Amino acid sequence: MAFQLALDALAPTTHRDPSLHPILESTVDSIRSSIQTYPWSIPKELLPLLNSYGIPTSGLGTSHHPHAAHKTIETFLLCTHWSFQATTPSSVMFMKPSKFNKLAQVNSNFRELKNYRLHPNDSTRYPFTSPDLPVFPTIFMHDALMYYHPSQIMDLFLRKPNLERLYASLVVPPEAHLSDQSFYPKLYTYTTTRHTLHYVPEGHEAGSYNQPSDAHSWLRINSIRLGNHHLSVTILESWGPVHSLLIQRGTPPPDPSLQAPPTLMTSDLFRSYQEPRLDVVSFRIPDAIELPQATFLQQPLRDRLVPRAVYNALFTYTRAVRTLRTSDPAAFVRMHSSKPDHDWVTSNAWDNLQTFALLNVPLRPNVVYHVLQSPIASLSLYLRQHWRRLTATAVPILSFLTLLQRFLPLPIPLAEVKSITAFRRELYRKKEPHHPLDVFHLQHRVRNYHSAISAVRPASPPHQKLPHALQKAALLLLRPISPLLTATPFFRSEQKSMLPNAELSWTLKRFALPWQASLVLLALSESSILLHKLFSPPTLQAQHDTYHRHLHPGSYSLQWERTPLSIPRTTAFLPFTPTTSTAPPDRSEASLPPAFASTFVPRPPPAASSPGAQPPTTTAAPPTPIEPTQRTHQNSDLALESSTSTEPPPPPIRSPDMTPSAPVLFPEINSPRRFPPQLPATPDLEPAHTPPPLSIPHQDPTDSADPLMGSHLLHHSLPAPPTHPLPSSQLLPAPLTNDPTAIGPVLPFEELHPRRYPENTATFLTRLRSLPSNHLPQPTLNCLLSAVSDQTKVSEEHLWESLQTILPDSQLSNEETNTLGLSTEHLTALAHLYNFQATVYSDRGPILFGPSDTIKRIDITHTTGPPSHFSPGKRLLGSQPSAKGHPSDPLIRAMKSFKVSGNYLPFSEAHNHPTSISHAKNLISNMKNGFDGVLSLLDVSTGQRTGPTPKERIIQIDHYLDTNPGKTTPVVHFAGFAGCGKTYPIQQLLKTKLFKDFRVSCPTTELRTEWKTAMELHGSQSWRFNTWESSILKSSRILVIDEIYKMPRGYLDLSILADPALELVIILGDPLQGEYHSQSKDSSNHRLPSETLRLLPYIDMYCWWSYRIPQCIARLFQIHSFNAWQGVIGSVSTPHDQSPVLTNSHASSLTFNSLGYRSCTISSSQGLTFCDPAIIVLDNYTKWLSSANGLVALTRSRSGVQFMGPSSYVGGTNGSSAMFSDAFNNSLIIMDRYFPSLFPQLKLITSPLTTRGPKLNGATPSASPTHRSPNFHLPPHIPLSYDRDFVTVNPTLPDQGPETRLDTHFLPPSRLPLHFDLPPAITPPPVSTSVDPPQAKASPVYPGEFFDSLAAFFLPAHDPSTREILHKDQSSNQFPWFDRPFSLSCQPSSLISAKHAPNHDPTLLPASINKRLRFRPSDSPHQITADDVVLGLQLFHSLCRAYSRQPNSTVPFNPELFAECISLNEYAQLSSKTQSTIVANASRSDPDWRHTTVKIFAKAQHKVNDGSIFGSWKACQTLALMHDYVILVLGPVKKYQRIFDNADRPPNIYSHCGKTPNQLRDWCQEHLTHSTPKIANDYTAFDQSQHGESVVLEALKMKRLNIPSHLIQLHVHLKTNVSTQFGPLTCMRLTGEPGTYDDNTDYNLAVIYSQYDVGSCPIMVSGDDSLIDHPLPTRHDWPSVLKRLHLRFKLELTSHPLFCGYYVGPAGCIRNPLALFCKLMIAVDDDALDDRRLSYLTEFTTGHLLGESLWHLLPETHVQYQSACFDFFCRRCPRHEKMLLDDSTPALSLLERITSSPRWLTKNAMYLLPAKLRLAITSLSQTQSFPESIEVSHAESELLHYVQ
């Protein structure tokens, strides 16, 4: 802690780094070790979990794996956990040999490996099956325990008496007994079906496997007992689902504490030591609590487990808020349920949690805390709190006292009258009691009792039982009548008195109530207790305990008690009887490497000639293990495994039967289906006498047969095919194979000299050096040696001699080193020898060479040349500019739009293929050494050399790959069934102009010939068709690879890397028809993963049809064929002359060719098409044909197949071909059976692609109605904030960021259902706050012009009434002047132009109807004529030409983007008007209002421009008020189109939609030229002149984007059926319909491109305004278009063009000063200057900030008005507003003053403000809402980039 405080104190100083250096230095070794041991890229969410398990992984690995966390756990188990346990020689079971070799390198005590093939797929994992059991006393069982029953483990111990310990790894989720829900779903998931548990590691479905569902019972037992045999089971460690168990012989000794004598325990302190302890185990799970069960309900435990942190936070939240609504707990839970840490919680658990929290909110603990109280007050409080309990306790006690007299006789002193005398007479005497027969001698016993009492108390006689004090009290009471008592016996007087006298007797007499009364009292007391318990609440203590137990449950722990297991018998451990073996003698680690201790060799079968050879006899074997569907280690391949092996191994064999009765923990053994029948043993397998070492997996071809290979394997192997006929040029042998200085097989350098090399740097092929150095002369081109010598201080001679000790001479002195010099292969060898790592800085960036486990580092710079050169040291290079888009994008778009016979190409997208250097290096190395291909072996020494030889070219490419990293290239994959027509559409595509720069690569010369014939190119273009080798040496923009799967592995990567000019790759092929296999035994190409799996993600769709195969073949494959010929499937004895012959081998093919038949192998016929029936030759190799080759053979011919050869090969027996047998017998060929791992993953399409747009059904989801009370009424005037009508309030709590949706509670009930109210799924990017730095410009020089002087004489003297009109005898009112103030001139300035005020001019709208509206003759819908269709198509083609689009291409519909447009449209509709306005227009959503009806009203405005200044009456602009349904449904469509238009618009076309004046200025400066004149155009009645062609154009635009058809139909229906209050209208443009501006702009642009050949000429369009930079030639078809148009043009050739109120030119743009001058005059006279001044000032600054160049934009007549405006702002604006006239950064105080009152700031003014000011203003609440806010426009322009 003190050290951390010191570091914090040093943080701001320079002493922190030196202080941290020791810490960083200490972590280097651990990080390096972690990266080397665990090199995989682990998901970041799993890294903390692995670290909590104690696994030291750093998370910095880069290798990818489908289940990297499982590999990490497994590596830790083997290399760390098991390695420490293996202290003696041990055996390992169920592990790949390669993995075992690496494990043995970690710990040499791992001596032998035993593998058993218990499943057919185990043959891919285990090369051999061990015939015997392990021999060492310690065994490690790898990931197989879950498939074995304890009885089988007992059998293993009984069969191996020397076996003491069995370490086993078990993979089973410990929570499997709860449910199918995993506690760590990111790490693993599982499901349980019947008796099988299906385990999926890290979501890798392909790596899933099955195991018995009761495998978790291994975690519930602690011992196994069979008679006198005992095995103890110990759980050593658990890492999630992986557990390490130790099973050892015997039982553990008893706990010493249990032997302690009982006499030692004199207290309770150590009492538990005397009791036996439970064997409880627990497992790590997420921190959770268990919710209580609901009352009288049973809920699964898994649905009641919730995170403790969430529960505690929710508990506090529900009691901390002031107001809690019913939806608050659910909303709180919703915030946490989406967190990744809580993915283990079920949805039912979340539901139970929020319900539990809501229903238990009222509960509070009933406790009080009285500290400072007196004892009496505390006693009073105690009695008040506990009086019920005290009473209930006292009543039974009192009831019991009533019976005490009957069971315990206690005498009570009572006075009894014996006699009464008077007048000397005895009037009364008590009779003596009668003494009945004392049966039980009670009197005797009483006397004895009294005698005993008397003996103790002799002073108490039997009949004088009164105490002495009582006797004295009696004498005092009787003293007054003592004379009368003298005669009583008490006083010993016999004389009777005259006076009345009574004789009393005082005795101790027993008294008792009747027993019936006692029982009644007792029953009443017990009843009171019962009633108290039934009707009274629990006690305070019980309430307190229940509250805390109910609302504060403890943490849930996954634990249970382990118990012993007794088994009645054993079950065989193996399915065969193992042989006996003994342990090999122990040898030192230095003398003997780890190897298989008892690897067996299959016994060769007896010779056929031996007369005594008999078939081996078989014996019965014990039952097999419990059914293991798959083993765990086949899914989580360890780190010890090769990194290139990602395919999971096969599972062990499934056991169908079981034998009876077993313990309950493993019920599978009771099932008779679990164990298989008795299997025969394999007596022909015996152990080898001399185990070969594992470190030599390959043999020299000249050596004898591999001892690990049995002769029966050699017997079934294929014979070597005959050699091919040599080509015309001489072939040379591969130098590396025949190098006498090398020995052993050809292997990658990293395998011969294993170390941690950087990826793809040590994969070059070489051989071990066998001879010492031959002292070769040092090469002349030795710059690499010089660079290394300068860095390592080792001489060049020593470096060269060192290379001759590790590399063969053929790799040191050859044509490559003599011509191009040494390469990085030699650098890697030097780095390995001298233990350094080199960083080579090439043109493409730094690349590491040499081992990574060294500390020494050197730097080398490589320049590509020519010639290339290595130099010491590091060269600093500047960064390259980033690309602005891939050059293949136009090609891909063209492919998407290309059609052949009306069908699209069958693909969806181009996939970016990241090239693999390792794949390319592997192939080029094999080509360079002559293992694949023949180019490097061609001898061209006899011919005249005009350039580098093919081998030199290959070497150059190899060098290029060493210093250039990979790149990413688009790849389009066309895949389909044989004959589906993959080639023909591509051939037609390549004939187009855009794809003319291509080349085709084919696997065979036959296929290349077919391409040449089909393309029909000139002879000079024949170089474009190549075989796969020669294609690598050529260059083109587009590469087509036909039959990609017949190319060597890595060919795609090498083709891309070898051609820097390549932009697009098109690959054709069928993954079902097999792949390439090298014919050279030295080729390492087979080490690469299969291309079928690697290219599978690129297959967007698989064409499941055929144009080739006849109907008889199509029926076999259940596929549709367009070939109507029925075809034939039969057999022939001899081939026909014209029929092609397909053979299995090259030798047979050569034989048939020599006999005069056309023949080829089945494999080489792939891609060919035959017209005659194909003849398939059947021979002894037919049964070995793969399913892929069988498919190729059956699908070559258009007319069928005929088999020639013995019919036994198609008879369906074991010696026949299964697919050929099905075909010959007309049986269906099930593709899933022949291609089980590949065919199910193909996305089949059954017909050619006719459209690319998806089909959408439905529009809006139905919403649940809200039911209200029938007597629910609202007041007549409802305020917008009224909320008493809310039935419930459910506020949304978004997961990220604030709520962006606006409130909809105020919407009219009829409009609310029209809103989707969708939350935006895409967060818009933050608006850039950066401000462009101001550029220094010369301030403009203004001629002196006084604003007031110019304004005084600007307005001419005239009578305003002369400019008005009469409409139906009523004068208009567009020039009001009466009582209007004025100060600048003699009349109000508002008379400058007409003012449209519908409220003050009743004639405005009626008088404007005839000019603004066009009516239909009847109510019938508008009919789209043929001319409309033709003109619409012409305009659409012109519009596509403007956007460089293909008219026939379509864009797939993007539902996510459309949903965002819906949200954006609703946001604009709710924010563009105030809530009061929306409520006031509730009738717009009235259901009785037909959505085709439009209400027309006049727009209120005072428009001031050049056309209206000093003009007369002007018709108003009409607005169309449409139904809300139209706006909310079609509005998103227009915004959707706008996004794509903005993305596709060429830079030479400017659209002013959503643009600011500053953007207009920048575009003009970039694109407009100084050429004059420019063409400006405006139309007369543009909206009214659009007829049916506009509807056709708009429909075609929507169809291109694949807008749902019902929306297109709705748009057409509205346009052709619109009606108003004045009558039905034509399909004219209505201002107010969705997309008015966009559609007008597109129509205008289409007309321009129909009239002119635009080319790259800059064009500006905005609605009906347009500007062309210079005159253009007219198109030849313009007259045909013009005659159909209804437009009236207003063309103007001018040197000072006006566009959207701005004068534009190459200098920029400037606001029309005349219009601005008039607006200022009107603002002054209207006394509205304070509200409008800032807006006008910002418009003025656009041109003012241009500097002196602004004068080039204005006509001379407007210079005075520009100067007057400048004078006005200088005089009338305050200082803080004048800062807008300067480019300098404003001061903070001035900024605050400007943003203090922007209430009347207009939209244009907002656009013109600098970004800093605009951001400050928008943060203020009083800013008004614009009809189209800047945020909406920005979102529309940026949305496409975040969706696509």
Swiss-Prot record:
Q: Give residue ranges for domain RdRp catalytic.
A: 1572-1678
At what residues does the UniProt record annotate the site feature described as Cleavage? S879, Q880, A1259, T1260
Q: Which domain of life is it from?
A: Viruses
Pfam families the record matches: Peptidase_C21, RdRP_2, Salyut, Viral_helicase1, Vmethyltransf
- UniProt entry tagged with the keyword Metal-binding: no
Limits of the Alphavirus-like MT domain: 58-219
Active site residues according to the UniProt entry: C783 (for protease activity), H869 (for protease activity)
Question: What residue spans carry the Low complexity bias annotation?
Answer: 609-621, 726-736
Tell me what effect the entry lists for G865A.
Answer: 70% loss of deubiquitinase activity
Q: Which GO terms describe its biological process?
A: DNA-templated transcription; methylation; mRNA modification; proteolysis; RNA processing; symbiont-mediated perturbation of host ubiquitin-like protein modification; viral RNA genome replication
Q: Which UniProt keywords apply?
A: ATP-binding, Host-virus interaction, Hydrolase, Methyltransferase, Modulation of host ubiquitin pathway by viral deubiquitinase, Modulation of host ubiquitin pathway by virus, Multifunctional enzyme, Nucleotide-binding, Nucleotidyltransferase, Protease, RNA-directed RNA polymerase, Thiol protease, Transferase, Viral RNA replication
Residue intervals of the OTU domain? 728-879
Motif interval(s): GPP flap: 865-867
- Note the SS bond partners: none
What are the Peptidase C21 domain coordinates in residue numbering? Answer: 730-884
Give the binding site residues for ATP. G976, F977, A978, G979, C980, G981, K982, T983
**(+)RNA virus helicase C-terminal domain boundaries:** 1104-1236
As recorded in UniProt, its EC number(s) are: 2.1.1.-, 3.4.19.12, 3.4.22.-, 3.6.4.-
Q: PTM per UniProt?
A: Specific enzymatic cleavages by the host yield mature proteins.
Name the Gene Ontology molecular function terms of this record. ATP binding; cysteine-type endopeptidase activity; mRNA methyltransferase activity; RNA binding; RNA-directed RNA polymerase activity
Q: Where is this region: Disordered?
A: 571-739, 859-887
Family affiliation: Belongs to the Tymoviridae non-structural replication polyprotein family.
Name this protein carries in UniProt: Non-structural replication polyprotein
Look up and give the organism this protein is from.
Answer: Turnip yellow mosaic virus
